[in-house]
Amino acid sequence: MPTCSRLIALDTETTGLYPQCGDRLISIGCVEILTNGEPGASYHQLINPQRPVSAGAQRVHGYSWEMLKSQPRFVDIADDFLNFVEGATLVIHNARFDIGFLNAELAIVNRGCMADYCEGVIDTLSLARQKPPGKPASLDALCKAFNIDASGRTLHGAFIDSMLLVQVYNSLTKLP
């Protein structure tokens, strides 16, 4: 595990599952993980995806196109987001999904990819599948397994999920 890099728990919400088919980000949530494991500075932004939200995605996170159309576009928030995460190691649950969407958004605005800005990525889904192997590894299952209070979370949300991820990461990295 990195010790010299700043750690940031990150989660996203999207219009659907496939950035290669035009699905877009609708929310980014980031929470710094301090050296004592506590949450630090945070960044959260709703985003106008410039397209409708699929019914399936809306059931997951509760955001509709009507709720998002007045939010800034990714191009408008890219600098603030990248400044927040620059030089950090990102802690992401199912990193392939989130990094795929972030890279797709960065490509649209000609800003390279996440690897250009961040030191690395720790995928807590991969960690969870190793410790102990064979057990459910969803964020919900890990919160339950580690007795993390997720009662304030009725739907997925990038910010609340990144806050829960701080606790899940701390629990996973304390396991032998």
Please identify what each model-predicted range represents.
Residues 100, 125, 163:
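Active-site phosphate/pyrophosphate-handling residues
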Residues 1-118, 129, 133, 137, ...:
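Conserved non-catalytic scaffold segment of RNase H-like nuclease domains
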Residues 1-2, 168-176:
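Acidic two-metal-ion nuclease catalytic site recognized across multiple nuclease folds
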Residues 157-169:
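Acidic, divalent-metal-coordinating active-site segment for phosphoryl/phosphodiester hydrolysis
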